[in-house]
Amino acid sequence: MKKTTKQRLAKADQKMLKIVRDHLDYHLIRVRKWLPYNGRRTSRDVVYEAFIDHGQVSIPVPTDRYSFYVCMHEVGHIVKGERNYAYMQEYVAEQYAIAKCIKHGYLTKEIEESAKRYVFEHMVQDCVIRVLPIDSFSKAVLKWTGRTEEQLRRRALRLAKVLYKDSDEVPNALTSLTAKKLSLSAYKALLEITIKQLTK
């Protein structure tokens, strides 16, 4: 049987929940959904996200340090309002979340490493899906992730080749960026351009 929001919140770490609610209230952010915390496993049914234009978030019930960090990450999207490239949006939200974890004594090495991986993967996606040239990425952000331009190039090339070979649809992320619907052949052509750029 599906749990109610009240039942989910009863399982929260009450100290963490108070901190999260204080941040939400201070920044006038409304919770669209309190979602179950899925223990860092990805799930199509549980998606934590921020709706910047509406000042709303869907966040996990904070039960441990990691779920607290996820809450702060989504709050960070609203507070900072970064709308630039995906990797920059995530970097700014991660910096906000890490700062709050440090302030409240919840930062762990695992959280920090997870944040760096997450931002790097968005750099890879921006490189492939948005066809951003590698030298256009922030050097400071790349350095913070602990990766190099060469690592970014190799990872992006690997992803582009997989997508080029296996794709049978245009990603939603790319469709939402274009004024008109992008055909699959146009998407494949974009991937081909990306592969050529990355193999120069």
Indicate where each model-derived feature is located.
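An active-site-proximal "capping" alpha-helix that borders the catalytic cofactor pocket
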Residues: 88-103
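Charged, often glycine-rich, active-site loop that binds/positions anionic groups
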Residues: 45-47, 94, 127
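Catalytic Zn2+-binding segment of zinc metalloproteases
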Residues: 60, 75-92
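A metal-dependent hydrolase signature that marks the N-terminal structural subdomain at the beginning
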Residues: 1-37, 196
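Short alpha-helical catalytic segment bearing the HExxH-like zincin motif
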Residues: 66-74
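Active-site scaffold of zinc-dependent metalloenzymes
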Residues: 26-65, 78-81
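Long, well-structured alpha-helical subdomains associated
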Residues: 62-63, 103-200
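Active-site catalytic microenvironments for nucleophilic, acid-base chemistry
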Residues: 78, 82, 99-104, 197
